[in-house]
Amino acid sequence: MLYMAIMIPAIITVLMDNRQPAKTMAWILVLAFMPFVGIIFYIFFGQNTRKERLISDRSMDQLTKRSMLEFAEQENLHIPANNKPLMNLFTNQNWAFPFKDNQVDIFTDGYEFIFSLLYNIGKAKHHVHLDTYIFEDDALGYLVADALIDKAEQGVEVRLIYDDVGCWKVKDSFFERMREAGIDVHSFMPVRFPAFTSKVNYRNHRKICVIDGRVGFIGGMNIAKRYVKGTGKQKWRDTHLRMEGGGVYALQRAFLIDWYFVDRTLVSNRKYYPPVDSKIRNNCLVQVVTSSPIAPWPDIMQGYVRILLQAQKYVYMETPYFLPTEPVLFAMRTAALAGVDIRLLMPRHSDARMVEWASRSYLMEAIEAGVKVYLYTGGFNHSKLLVSDDNLCTVGSTNVDFRSFENNFEANAFFYDEEMAQRIKRIYLKDESSSILVDDVAYFVRRPFLKRLFESIVRLHSPLL
């Protein structure tokens, strides 16, 4: 009786989510064959949060239309016709408005990024807004923390959001020291018993910094020593951007929405959206697109699918982890079969063994359709970028995996500009020159049967990795 009392409501809950039939059946089977363990798994990893409204439409309206758009001056936008549907997709669903007049620096190693971040924090006059997944209490973390504390003691507004799970191993005293110095610090969706439920699976993976509303950072680098020094014998390769211009408005909005999420304070004022420097005048268009498990649609994933299916010549992608959702893998295979040059570059060895094992069966499917897979041998490549047809590119925090597309809070900058696309393309090709091409499925098939069987079993857990 106890079994039935638990199972029937659980199965009804799964059915009422109205997901894809395959996913619904998978969860029903888990609940049926592992009743008690299955329920725990479902609570942690299976709940559908897209129906939750953790931020009201009214608050979103105030944080967007009545703040950013009120101060943003956008005239004579020259929108490329071939990318207009993609831009409309992001604008209609995500309120990710395009901004022109952007100046961008690209960092491909941690030294450059941290130096620039510290330099710009040091120049801050009004505010520093930092949103990061990992903020470790190592030597580098203390360096950044000290810079933030110095600014707070000078009277500069400093707001910090760190992810509670990403910083699980960091001592509370590290952040308390910043609070005592006057920094407004919040952990994102803290995981505490008895609230230890699905929150553990939905994390803020964004890496955003905005300084005085004039300078912004976005990309794949967290605040930790390994992003500079590497791990063990492996060098660390990553991509991060520094932006000035109209796109900083969008980065500011992304941060302030997260701030409302953690602090329930609507921050909206002209001083957070200062006029763009008159020296920056170009048609480098950018949309800062965010995605989250509470949004109605998986916006960044839809953007990747759209790019893959609209490409005429090529799509080059870099990701540290490859556990693609069905729509993304299908789009990659479809584009490759249509003759588009689809290339995927990822590390030869991952920093997460389970992810590496699970990814191999997906790589086999991609290669069978003609996708060129490159395994990076110059260290651990943590970069998340995409470039297509010499006119479109994106850099951000999003991996090509279930977790980024479905579960995490992510942020990417999408650029519609030939010069920017060429710069990202050159970075990709340089990484490709330090990689080995795997264009034959036999590379994976030659491995022992039991090893391939194990990898296929691990693949079943891809949404959880």
What are these regions (language model features)?
Residues 311-312, 321-343, 347-348, 352:
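Helical hairpin unit composed of two closely spaced alpha helices linked by a short loop
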Residues 295, 299, 319, 323, ...:
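A short glycine-/small-residue-rich loop at the edge of a beta-strand within enzyme catalytic domains
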Residues 338, 343-388:
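A beta-strand-loop signature enriched in Asp, Gly, Thr, and Trp
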